[in-house]
UniProtKB/Swiss-Prot annotation:
GO terms for cellular component: cytosolic large ribosomal subunit. The keyword Ribosomal protein applies. Residues 184-206 are annotated as: Disordered. The gene is RPL13. GO terms for molecular function: RNA binding; structural constituent of ribosome. Belongs to the eukaryotic ribosomal protein eL13 family. This is Large ribosomal subunit protein eL13. It comes from Tetrahymena thermophila (strain SB210). Keywords: Ribonucleoprotein, Ribosomal protein. GO terms for biological process: translation. Residues 184-193 have a biased composition (Basic and acidic residues). PROSITE patterns: RIBOSOMAL_L13E.
């Protein structure tokens, strides 16, 4: 309810109760989800229950200072870490062929994330006694002795840092930072058309 309006009087009929969605099974559904999570953890044991995801920036200028887990690693990040896309998907790494790396920082961050995951990885041979060599060497041990209680192998890093106090507050307040950023974006947007217009004006008219 908003504003100073009169309260609505719902003149309901008995047959209208079937058009209302109820959730009397909320506690039972909560229990079912718990059993499903346990069944999934038992099925993928000794692997983590979640696959490895990249660290990405949130969208829009308002939220892009914080990070979150993305959909999957780019092909450039996998190539930098020396992992093929097919092999990555087989060892619990999510791959997103649509995402692109816009800066070197994100590429290096996720490359380190991949290498940290691979350094912790323990692979067991598909066929007993036939271990393979590669980026991650197979072990001769059986998987029965392995233990893994982690939900995810490489958690999301905490990037929040406490800012140091500065003394030149008065000078900083005089600068209209948002206006400067918007002006630079506008200049970048119209740079091509302005150059074309200047070039057309500089050419001699026939």
């Amino acid at each position: 309810m908003k504003h100073n309006n009169q309260l609505p009087v719902a003149q309901l009929r008995k047959h209208q109760q079937f058009r209302i969605k109820t959730f009397f099974n909320q506690a039972a559904q909560k229990k079912a989800r718990l059993h499903a999570r346990r069944a999934q953890a038992a099925a993928v044991f000794p692997r983590p229950t979640e696959k490895l995801q990249p660290v990405v920036r949130k969208q829009t200028q308002r939220y892009n200072k914080s990070t979150k887990l993305g959909r999957g690693f780019t092909l450039q990040e996998l190539k930098a870490a020396g992992i093929s896309a097919a092999f990555a998907q087989s060892i619990g790494i999510k791959v997103d062929h649509r995402r692109k790396n816009r800066c070197q920082e994100s590429l290096e961050l996720n490359k380190k994330r991949l290498l940290a995951y691979v350094s912790k990885l323990v692979l067991f041979p598909r066929h007993q006694g036939k271990a393979k060599k590669g980026l991650v060497n197979d072990t001769a041990d059986t998987s029965s002795a392995a233990q893994n209680a982690l939900q995810t192998s490489v958690p999301l890093p905490s990037v929040s840092k406490r800012e140091k106090a500065v003394s030149n507050i008065a000078e900083l307040r005089k600068k209209k930072v948002y206006r400067i950023i918007r002006q630079e974006k506008t200049n970048q947007k119209w740079d091509g058309k302005r150059k074309a217009k200047a070039q057309a004006a500089a050419e001699p008219k026939a």
